[in-house]
C-alpha cells in the first residue's frame, strides 16, 4: 500500500440505541464522543439506529408483507378500466 493516502483505520464502538448493544470493530469513521470499553480502554462511539442485534431479519421477527394484496389494490385504484 502507498503511504499517506489511506484514511486512519482505528477501533470504534458502534452502539445500537434500540437494542442497547455495542460492537467494537475497526473503521475509518470518527466521533467526538467516547466510551470506556470492557477492556478498560476508551474508544470513539457511534450511535446507530439499527444493527444485526435489532434488525427484524436477523432477530427472526420479520413480518411477511402482503404484496399480492397491494398489487390488487393498486390495479383497482389506477388500473385500466
Curated annotation (Swiss-Prot):
Indicate the segments annotated as coiled coil, or none if absent.
none
- Among its keywords, does the record have Ribonucleoprotein? yes
| Molecular functions per Gene Ontology | structural constituent of ribosome
Which InterPro entries does this chain map to?
Answer: Ribosomal_bL28/bL31-like_sf (IPR034704), Ribosomal_bL31 (IPR002150), Ribosomal_bL31_B (IPR027493), Ribosomal_bL31_sf (IPR042105)
Report one GO cellular component: ribosome
Q: Which GO terms describe its biological process?
A: translation
A Pfam family per the record: Ribosomal_L31
Highest taxon, organism lineage: Bacteria
User: Which keywords belong to this entry?
Assistant: Ribonucleoprotein, Ribosomal protein
Q: Does the keyword NADP apply?
A: no
Its family remark reads:
Belongs to the bacterial ribosomal protein bL31 family. Type B subfamily.
Q: How does it assemble?
A: Part of the 50S ribosomal subunit.
- Protein name, as recorded: Large ribosomal subunit protein bL31B
Biological classification of the source: Bacteria, Bacillati, Actinomycetota, Actinomycetes, Propionibacteriales
Amino acid at each position: 500500500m502507498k503511504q499517506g493516502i489511506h484514511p486512519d483505520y482505528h477501533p470504534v464502538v458502534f452502539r445500537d440505541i434500540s437494542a442497547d448493544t455495542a460492537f467494537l470493530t475497526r473503521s475509518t469513521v470518527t466521533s467526538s464522543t467516547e466510551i470506556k470499553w470492557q477492556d478498560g480502554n476508551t474508544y470513539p462511539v457511534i450511535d446507530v439506529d439499527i444493527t444485526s442485534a435489532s434488525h427484524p431479519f436477523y432477530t427472526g421477527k420479520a413480518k411477511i408483507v402482503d404484496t399480492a394484496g397491494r398489487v390488487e389494490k393498486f390495479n383497482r385504484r389506477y388500473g385500466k378500466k
